[in-house]
Amino acid sequence: MRKLWGLYLGLLDNHPLVTKSLSTGFLMGTGDILAQRLEHKFKDEKSQFKLDYKRVATMSTVGIFYSGPMLHYWYRSLDIMVKGEGRSVIIKKMLIDQLLFAPVAIGGFMTVTNFINNKGELKNLENFTKELFYAVKINWLIWPAAQIINFSLVPPNLRVLYSSIISIFWGMFLSHISFDKDHHIRNQNKEIN
């Protein structure tokens, strides 16, 4: 395990963007597999579980080409924007991250997955907006504390990995609201009632 960790750190030093992007893609795909297993368990335990490989590939691809690179550049930019150490710097970084970056990143993620799911068409803007606000509210229950830990304890070169590990669980939630047909039907029924 120590050799594997050393290899990862070496790749991180020599190829930071590629390493972070691939790690994020792997962990987002893992989160989606877990989300699918949980969705199956809560819906219909009698039928045999069948993994949706396209959905896993979509989440992994979004991690590699969207989330990983975005986080790499975001954390670098945040360190340039807010310099120094101490509690006030950590709080400033967390607030900027959560009030500016998080809504844009979540909206971007949902736009990309919506675009992929609907074969190039963006559908139902009103439902998209409701789901975005819902996701941002849930985000604020999890990520402020996670980011305080990230900005205070995690070395800058490992922040994307840390966020990606936390994102296994966060990705399960985003995957669920992006792909689960029953979730979309429940939201549409709430509109009608």
Curated annotation (Swiss-Prot):
Mode of membrane association: Multi-pass membrane protein
InterPro entries: Mpv17_PMP22
Key words, A-Z: Membrane, Transmembrane, Transmembrane helix
Signal sequence interval, chain numbering: none
One cellular component (GO) term of this entry: mitochondrion
Ranges annotated as spanning the membrane: 56-78, 96-116, 132-152, 160-180
Pfam families reported in the protein's UniProt record: Mpv17_PMP22 (PF04117)
Subcellular localization: Membrane
Database matches in PANTHER family: PEROXISOMAL MEMBRANE PROTEIN 2, PXMP2 MPV17 (PTHR11266), PROTEIN MPV17 (PTHR11266:SF17)
Family classification: Belongs to the peroxisomal membrane protein PXMP2/4 family.
Name of this protein: PXMP2/4 family protein 2
Organism in which the protein naturally occurs: Dictyostelium discoideum
